[in-house]
Amino acid sequence: MKIDILSIFPDMFSGVTGSSIIKKAIENERVAVEVTDFREYAEGKHQVVDDYPYGGGAGMLLKAQPIFDAVQAVKDKQPETKPRVILMDPAGKRFDQKMAEEFAEEEHLVFICGHYEGYDERIREHLVTDEVSIGDYILTGGEIGAMIVMDSVIRLLPGVLGNKDSAVTDSFSTGLLEHPHYTRPADFRGMKVPDILLSGNHAWIEEWRDKESLKRTYERRPDLLKNYPLTDKQKTWLKEWSDSK
């Protein structure tokens, strides 16, 4: 996969691309990440990327020209692919695991990271394929949001995680929150690991994990259960918890 990031603050990405899983993914050629300062594509001596909005109003808007030209430049470097051009924007579709899995199937992603009051609307209408938000709050720019999406996508690529099952069993990947985890020692200052995890009975352990995953979802994110295909056993567990309230 190729990921291009367009930002007027490219140095923000050096820590993300130079450490942990993303660094290893780049070194192992599972993904290539290139960060471009789209100010370099702004016309004029001063390379201005923002301007006042027509009709007045607070703040400045990112101009269409530098971003259009920067996107075209990264497309020209990889003409054999048709990239998803992703605009990081609080008005976009809420990012979730399903979207991460969808993006992970692509060959080329281009992230546009904005600043100031917003974007010239022609960028939305004629350039981007996806508008993505990471939540109902406002950040200084789109860079942190792009880092979150990029991290979530890269870890899903084949060969990136040491254990291929890790991404599959994470919270949200199955539609439910992940079950609790424990490691050694079995007794830490009187706080003990559930006996069933020490039993060696894999069938019991899997059922315990399934039940705890459902319980955690029921208690913390009941909205996720609205369209979840519950088994008869899971329905019984939910009824037990509901009746005990």
Swiss-Prot record:
Q: Where in the cell is it found?
A: Cytoplasm
The record's subunit annotation is:
Homodimer.
Explain the purpose of this protein: Specifically methylates guanosine-37 in various tRNAs.
Keyword Cell membrane set for record: no
- Could you tell me which Gene3D superfamilies the record lists for this protein? 3.40.1280.10, tRNA(m1g37)methyltransferase, domain 2
Which amino acid positions bind S-adenosyl-L-methionine, per UniProt? Answer: G114, I134, G135, D136, Y137, I138, L139
- CDD domains in alphabetical order: TrmD-like (cd18080)
What's this protein's name? tRNA (guanine-N(1)-)-methyltransferase
This protein's gene is called: trmD
Q: Which domain of life is it from?
A: Bacteria
